[in-house]
Amino acid sequence: MIPKLHQYQIDNNVTAFSTMRSCDENSLQAEGKVSDAYASFNINPWVGDNEEQVNSNRLELAKALEINEKNIILPHQTHQTEVRQIASEFLSLPSSVQSMLLEGVDALITNEPNVCIGVSTADCVPVIMYDAEHKAIAVAHAGWRGTVENIMRKTVEKMYRSFNTDPKTLQVVIGPSISFESFEVGSDVFNAFNEKGLATDKQCVCSSAQLPSTNNSNVLVDNSAKDNEPKWHIDLAQCNKKQLESLGVPAQNITLSGICTYSNHHKYFSARRLGTASGRIYTGIILRG
């Protein structure tokens, strides 16, 4: 199956994208896959998908990107803040050793050309970074845990140490993720944000009662009246944007996709909508040689 890619126009020297499920829900219906939580394009091997299909999808993606399939790099993410540099030495290692080095990694950086570094998401925030001055790229997976632990800082600092990247020159894209309105959480998640001082900005965190009214039927319903537990909404994309700005990345250099995975689950995988046994969006970037 030829992958459908949502491409980001950052610079002529890079290719940046997020994979999509399908053109629309009707095409999934026509293919008989509307109930298939892995349809129509998943390359993540850790979510229960058919191994043969995953491998086939990787090959198709490599073909579409015009790179070697072995140069599609995908870490096994664990909602932490480990950042791994993909250097030329890494590319020459046996696949078993590469897999070991990618275990528990949630962000990648490289300055190697024609290597696609990417992360998997299905509501969490994928973030792409490009340093044109030093010809270096990065990609990070920021779920709520990674956001609380500021994976943006860890990634930018790693780029600085490895490539002398100046945050003021970074170009950043924040890809599809669950929206402020749809990401409802309990007190445990709110408290984690509050302890880090991230709950004071109402643009990023607010109670369900404070959420602006919306006619969107895809927005999660406030259950606080049912279980007497307060409910909160968090804008993960906005939180990560503000963290990047605090590191010196200019606001005008940060592009938000504005795509809610929960509301657009027929085009982008959403674990909240489809369950965790479902496909994942692959958001990647390639430095063209």
Protein language model features and the residues they cover:
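Active-site microenvironment for binding and transforming phosphate-containing groups
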Residues: 1-289
